[in-house]
């Protein structure tokens, strides 16, 4: 490709509304342009990267035995009503009616459509297992689209759905998809972790997220510094302290704390170690509970894990924190003065809190706290559960090493759905025993557009994008200096351009009448891995300057050797 016949569209300045580096660089490198909130046009450079990501995904899905299909973006509402998600999904589901007043949705996902297809096409266990995939546009009416294509309303996604007659068969496909995803992200040169995850609104049993590690990530990823253990912070188990609870050394005393309504204020005003404090959070109780509220206690320096808490049988789902009015109606004290002593509602304490002694907590009287509280002496030990977020330095749940926490961008997610959708839509086949059998499902997604942004978040420097070779828009940039004034520069540039293309190498030759500084800046901004610079001065010695984008290293290579050198560097 020649720049004179190409839409380069690079920008010198960073657009003011671009918050994260991937959004900034995708705009500056001429990869995307915003059409409306959460909607982007992909320009040629961006589309080349997107297609490379898509091709890697397609190759590995085919290698794993999945079958490609294509389903409509527009879906009839009756399928969503049948599955029960018409009301559950909320405002992110874009609903509309056609000219016949029939309701439809723009598909944010395709569980209903594929299940409808399978229930009409399959009749016998002999046809299973099958795993269908597509690479298709999705639309989710995000309330706050942000970060460019990282969280856009319209996006490209690879979604796959497998169908089985047994859990064992589902597990085999799930493991195959796990391995395929690992190959996909490894081939793209990404630093990622496959982490245990909560199944969320999709439902089902087992679930893993594939997270690209990046500072701009929205998720906290927990992993061991020694083993392969990795989990989303919502799911990571906080191991109970291994040391026995220390013996009491203080008497419980009631202390006036009128200006200490938070743990931070209590610690500062009374010079308490924060790890000797306990915070009490009140949430709505489950419907069958005798009490309207439940008290959840975590150590002062720990955070409540809302996903873990919501799964407790005593707690209402979705997790709902009590208002001050609701708290005072039951406890007769405000949120800043709550604690376990004389608490009139059920109490659940974190494992770490159960191991504490001589600690401070609210007295359930406004403006007062108890100091020196000890379990079983001052208050009976309540129900104990893992209800906190892990912190860096906690022991790994698998017993190997300690935990590290980094930010991650979710680029893939695999689920064992079980029978959630097949039961709702009555998708069944005749089983081996001749009886009707509801199908067991798995689903497997990759955010193709998000992968592009995530790759940039891991691969950039002060000059622009530094693409991994496998997904770079071009493999080689040819920069002929003053080619319109130097015949030998032009002749050699054209010769190398033809020879490299004949070797199957993707080349962008900058044949614009631009200053060298502009040409260098654009190629580095775009992030092409290999650059060769052809100039009269080096040609006097039969040399060409070669530069590798990632390391920045430069070297002089003889003109007769440069093609072989590049072919070897790119193809190995």
UniProtKB/Swiss-Prot annotation:
Q: Which InterPro entries match?
A: aa-tRNA-synt_IIb, aa-tRNA-synth_II, aa-tRNA-synth_II/BPL/LPL, Anticodon-bd, Anticodon-bd_dom_sf, Pro-tRNA-ligase_IIa, Pro-tRNA-synth_IIa_bac-type, Pro-tRNA-Synthase_IIa_type1
| EC code(s) of this entry | 6.1.1.15
Q: Where in the cell is it found?
A: Cytoplasm
User: What terms describe the molecular function in GO for this protein?
Assistant: aminoacyl-tRNA deacylase activity; ATP binding; proline-tRNA ligase activity
Q: How does it assemble?
A: Homodimer.
Which reaction does this chain catalyze? tRNA(Pro) + L-proline + ATP = L-prolyl-tRNA(Pro) + AMP + diphosphate
Per its database record, what is this protein's job? Answer: Catalyzes the attachment of proline to tRNA(Pro) in a two-step reaction: proline is first activated by ATP to form Pro-AMP and then transferred to the acceptor end of tRNA(Pro). As ProRS can inadvertently accommodate and process non-cognate amino acids such as alanine and cysteine, to avoid such errors it has two additional distinct editing activities against alanine. One activity is designated as 'pretransfer' editing and involves the tRNA(Pro)-independent hydrolysis of activated Ala-AMP.
Q: Which HAMAP family match?
A: Pro_tRNA_synth_type1
The entry's cellular-component GO terms read: cytosol
Which UniProt keyword terms apply here? Answer: Aminoacyl-tRNA synthetase, ATP-binding, Cytoplasm, Ligase, Nucleotide-binding, Protein biosynthesis
In its keyword annotation, does this UniProt entry include Oxidoreductase?
no
Return the similarity comment. Answer: Belongs to the class-II aminoacyl-tRNA synthetase family. ProS type 1 subfamily.
Which processes are annotated in GO (biological process)?
Answer: prolyl-tRNA aminoacylation
Ligase as a keyword of this entry, yes or no, is: yes
Q: What is this protein called?
A: Proline--tRNA ligase
Q: Which domain of life is it from?
A: Bacteria
The free-text domain remark for this protein reads: Consists of three domains: the N-terminal catalytic domain, the editing domain and the C-terminal anticodon-binding domain.
């Amino acid at each position: 490709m020649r720049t004179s016949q190409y839409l380069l569209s690079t920008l010198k300045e960073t657009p003011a509304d671009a918050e994260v580096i991937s959004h900034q660089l995708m705009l500056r490198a001429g990869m995307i342009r915003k059409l409306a909130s959460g909607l982007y046009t992909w320009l040629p450079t961006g589309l080349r990267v997107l297609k490379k990501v898509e091709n890697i995904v397609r190759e590995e899905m085919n290698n794993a035995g999945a079958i490609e299909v294509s389903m409509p973006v527009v879906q009839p509402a009756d399928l969503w009503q049948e599955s029960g998600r018409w009301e559950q999904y909320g405002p992110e589901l874009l609903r509309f009616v056609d000219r016949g007043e029939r309701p439809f949705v723009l598909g944010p996902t395709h569980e209903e459509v594929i299940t409808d297809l399978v229930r009409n096409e399959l009749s016998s266990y002999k046809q299973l297992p099958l795993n269908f995939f597509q690479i298709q546009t999705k639309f989710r009416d995000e309330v706050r689209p942000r970060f460019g294509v990282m969280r856009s309303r319209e996006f490209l996604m690879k979604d796959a759905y497998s169908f089985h007659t047994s859990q064992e068969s589902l597990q085999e496909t799930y493991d195959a998809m796990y391995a395929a995803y690992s190959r996909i992200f490894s081939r793209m040169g990404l630093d990622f972790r496959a982490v245990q995850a909560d199944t969320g609104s999709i439902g089902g049993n087992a679930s893993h997220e594939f997270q690209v590690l990046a500072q701009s990530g929205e998720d906290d990823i927990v992993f061991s510094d020694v083993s392969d253990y990795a989990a989303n912070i919502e799911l990571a188990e906080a191991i109970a302290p291994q040391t026995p609870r220390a013996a009491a050394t203080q008497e419980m005393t009631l202390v006036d704390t009128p200006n200490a309504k938070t743990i931070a204020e209590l610690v500062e005003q009374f010079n308490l170690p924060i790890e000797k404090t306990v915070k009490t959070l009140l949430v709505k109780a489950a419907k069958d509970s005798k009490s309207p509220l439940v008290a959840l206690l975590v150590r002062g320096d720990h955070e409540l894990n809302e996903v873990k808490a919501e799964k407790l049988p005593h707690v209402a789902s979705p997790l709902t924190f009590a208002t001050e009015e609701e708290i005072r109606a039951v406890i007769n004290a405000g949120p800043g003065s709550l604690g376990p002593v004389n608490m009139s509602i059920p109490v659940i304490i974190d494992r770490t809190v159960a191991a504490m002694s001589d600690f401070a907590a609210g007295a359930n009287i406004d403006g007062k706290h108890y100091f020196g509280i000890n379990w079983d002496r001052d208050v009976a030990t309540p129900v104990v559960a893992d209800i906190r977020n892990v912190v860096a330095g906690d022991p790994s749940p698998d017993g190997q090493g300690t935990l590290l926490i980094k930010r991650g961008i979710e680029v893939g997610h695999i689920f064992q759905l079980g029978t959630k959708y097949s039961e709702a839509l009555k998708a069944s086949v005749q089983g081996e025993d001749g009886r009707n059998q509801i199908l067991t499902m798995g689903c497997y997604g990759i955010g193709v557009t998000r992968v592009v942004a995530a790759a940039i978040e891991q691969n950039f420097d002060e000059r622009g994008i530094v693409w991994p070779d496998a997904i770079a828009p071009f493999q080689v940039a040819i920069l002929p200096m003053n080619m319109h004034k130097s015949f030998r520069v032009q002749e050699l540039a054209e010769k190398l351009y033809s020879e490299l293309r004949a070797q199957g190498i993707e080349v962008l030759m900058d044949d614009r009448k631009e200053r060298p500084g502009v040409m260098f800046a654009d190629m580095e901004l775009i992030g092409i891995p290999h650059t060769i610079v052809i100039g009269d001065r080096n040609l006097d010695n039969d040399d060409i300057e070669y530069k590798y984008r990632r390391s920045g290293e430069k070297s002089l290579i003889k003109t007769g050797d440069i093609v072989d050198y590049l072919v070897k560097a790119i193809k190995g």
